[in-house]
């Protein structure tokens, strides 16, 4: 990965942003394709397969984040790309039965809601953390509600622990 990063950095002028985005999306599609192929064969995805799927979701997030930073697709409402990513990752998590991708969906949702942790927040807590507690509690409440909805729908997927852990971490 470090070698790819150096290659892109040294040759970015020749590669260009659209080629980089296309390469990230193609790599993400390849990762998703392996999970879809496994699911269509009615096989159980291995732990390595789960992490390949997570890699695909992270590559998709990187492509969307880079496109937003480079081209300002959403303008002043730039944070909406996090909400779109949360929805896409949640759809992928439920479709492909992945707790890892669900955790990425919940993280993107928390980012959209404005819950963030930066090292700078430790040095200027009065300004940087203003309102963070309420946003974190709202996020925890949303995760509890999502877990309750999941339980109500009696989904066969074992996602309740993910919702509970995220809710507990954001509430504390």
Language-model features, listed with the residues they occupy:
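Alpha-helical multi-pass membrane segments and their bilayer interfacial helix-loop junctions
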Residues: 1-172
């Amino acid at each position: 990965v470090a070698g790819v990063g150096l290659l892109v950095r040294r040759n970015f002028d020749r590669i260009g942003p659209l080629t980089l985005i296309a390469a990230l999306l193609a790599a993400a599609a390849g990762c998703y394709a392996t999970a879809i192929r496994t699911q269509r064969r009615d096989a159980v995805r291995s732990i390595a397969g789960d992490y390949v799927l997570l890699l695909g979701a992270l590559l998709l997030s990187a492509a969307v984040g880079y496109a937003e930073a480079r081209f300002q697709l959403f303008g002043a409402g730039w944070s909406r790309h996090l909400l779109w990513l949360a929805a896409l990752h949640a759809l992928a998590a439920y479709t492909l039965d992945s707790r890892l991708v669900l955790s990425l969906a919940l993280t993107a949702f928390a980012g959209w809601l404005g819950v963030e942790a930066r090292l700078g927040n430790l040095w200027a807590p009065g300004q940087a953390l203003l309102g963070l507690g309420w946003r974190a509690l709202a996020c925890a409440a949303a995760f509890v509600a999502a877990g309750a909805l999941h339980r109500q729908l009696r989904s066969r997927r074992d996602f309740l622990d993910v919702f509970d852990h995220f809710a507990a971490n954001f509430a504390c």
